[in-house]
Amino acid sequence: MSSNKIVLTSSDGESFQVEEVVARKLQIVKHLLEDDCVINEIPLQNVTGNILSIVLEYCKKHVDDVVDDDASEEPKKKKPDDEAKQNLDAWDAEFMKNIDMETIFKLILAANYLNVEGLLGLTCQTVADYIKDKTPEEVRELFNIENDFTHEEEEEAIRKENAWAFEADTKHEDPKP
């Protein structure tokens, strides 16, 4: 593991000193390091300290993940065995269970900005699992979406969208006597 430390500074001025190998899990940081664009610290203007600390916790746990990037010059790490993968999956589930939905939305934005693919997938899957069995009204409430259709307009749109299901299939009808 690299002993080089990188200082990451959040949008609210909070600084985090992390191992370079952990910082490289943030693809935006990895590219800055590869392009020799780093002097003393890396400012991350779109991420608050609270969210960055959660992202870094995830990255520290996933520092040994296999990266399927053929252009990577780093030696490939061996694929984790089934038990290690199950342990990591269990850790991910526990990690997400303790985070409220508002923070998950902020993590999605941060993971996208920082290009942390594993965290982006995990957070998006968590939201997808959460809304899976919800009604449209419950989903609107969760995402603060205002329904601008009246009940009648909504029914008509559904009828139009599914009109094919109500059309008579003339090819298979019995001919009239």
Swiss-Prot record:
Could you tell me where this protein is found in the cell? Nucleus
Stored Gene3D superfamilies: Potassium Channel Kv1.1, Chain A (3.30.710.10)
Q: Where would one find the signal peptide in this protein?
A: none
Keywords from the named record:
Nucleus, Ubl conjugation pathway
Q: Name one GO cellular component term.
A: SCF ubiquitin ligase complex
| Assembly information from the UniProt record | Part of a SCF (SKP1-cullin-F-box) protein ligase complex.
Q: In which pathway does it act?
A: Protein modification; protein ubiquitination
Q: What is this protein called?
A: SKP1-like protein 15
Q: What does this protein do?
A: Involved in ubiquitination and subsequent proteasomal degradation of target proteins. Together with CUL1, RBX1 and a F-box protein, it forms a SCF E3 ubiquitin ligase complex. The functional specificity of this complex depends on the type of F-box protein. In the SCF complex, it serves as an adapter that links the F-box protein to CUL1.
Region described as Interaction with the F-box domain of F-box proteins: 108-167
Q: Name the predominant localization.
A: nucleus
Q: Kindly give the CDD domains that the UniProt entry links to this protein.
A: BTB_POZ_SKP1
Query: A GO biological process this protein is involved in?
Result: response to auxin
- Tissues expressing the protein: Expressed at low levels in seedlings and leaves.
The similarity annotation says: Belongs to the SKP1 family.
